[in-house]
């Protein structure tokens, strides 16, 4: 995979499509959190389906600069899209790629599912896939307890992941406001036809009921599974690819 930097801070891996087509179709992948960047295999799969793929790290996470959650992660996606008109430069050998996407799609899971849903508010984004997405941060107290016994979640992240996430207590607490990076806060702006969600009813981290309620309130299509836990985005996309491809093309 190639590497590029956008807006000075945002580092991303990217791949061109395996076969060039008449249309430039781009998929942007949004990671969960906390997680280790390992969607390279998914990026390769999507490249073989003839899509450009960009796999960014949020500001303040992993290779990217900045402070995590200083800005809403979906703004990182918007900023990345802003720079595409300039083309993409591989930082390793300086090779330049021209990319003027005719269609832009976003795929995100869990924490990144919120980024995908909020990215759908951008008119340049045609469709998004949200896999076991966080749609309302009111779930935070219970989900934190499911992940760690540390009462200070941001402190846990700093201890467990070091500088992989430059996360302050103040920035983490912004999620509890109900307005910051929260799809539910934007329910009135959602275009239901742009979003497809996948979720398992036995998810231990993101309650199915919260996603079902979001789907009912917005009209967004939700494909449910009886079992599966906290679904892997890579496995979901590959297993459901024919469904996703049809959704993208309509």
Regions from the PLM with identified roles:
Residues 1-22:
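N-terminal cap/lid segment of alpha/beta-hydrolase-fold proteins
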Residues 32-45, 67, 209:
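The serine-hydrolase catalytic nucleophile loop
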Residues 68-98:
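Alpha/beta-hydrolase active-site loop
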Residues 118, 122-170:
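Hydrolase active-site cap/lid region
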Residues 190-191, 196-199, 203:
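Short beta-strand/loop motif that positions the catalytic acidic residue
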């Amino acid at each position: 995979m190639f590497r590029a930097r956008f807006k000075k801070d945002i580092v991303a891996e990217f791949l061109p499509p395996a076969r060039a087509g008449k249309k430039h179709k781009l998929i942007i992948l949004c990671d969960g959190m906390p997680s280790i960047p390992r969607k390279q295999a998914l990026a390769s799969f999507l490249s073989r389906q003839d899509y450009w793929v960009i796999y960014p790290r949020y500001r303040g996470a992993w290779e990217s600069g900045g402070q995590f959650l200083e800005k809403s992660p979906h703004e990182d996606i918007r900023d990345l899209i802003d720079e595409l008109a300039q083309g993409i430069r591989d930082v390793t050998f300086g090779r330049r790629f021209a990319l003027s996407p005719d269609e832009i799609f976003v795929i995100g899971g869990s924490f990144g599912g919120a980024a995908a849903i909020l990215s759908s508010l951008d008119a340049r984004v045609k469709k998004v896939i949200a896999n076991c997405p966080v749609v309302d941060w009111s779930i935070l107290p219970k989900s934190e307890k499911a992940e760690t016994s540390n009462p200070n979640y941001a402190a846990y992240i700093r201890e467990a992941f070091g500088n992989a996430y430059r996360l302050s207590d103040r920035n983490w607490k912004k999620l509890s406001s109900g307005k910051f990076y929260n799809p539910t806060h934007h329910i009135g702006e959602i275009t239901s036809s742009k979003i497809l969600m996948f979720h398992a009813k036995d998810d231990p981290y993101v309650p199915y009921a919260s996603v079902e309620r979001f789907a009912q309130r917005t009209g967004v299509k939700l494909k449910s599974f009886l079992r599966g836990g906290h679904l892997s985005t890579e496995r979901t996309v590959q297993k459901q690819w024919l469904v996703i491809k049809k959704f993208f093309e309509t």
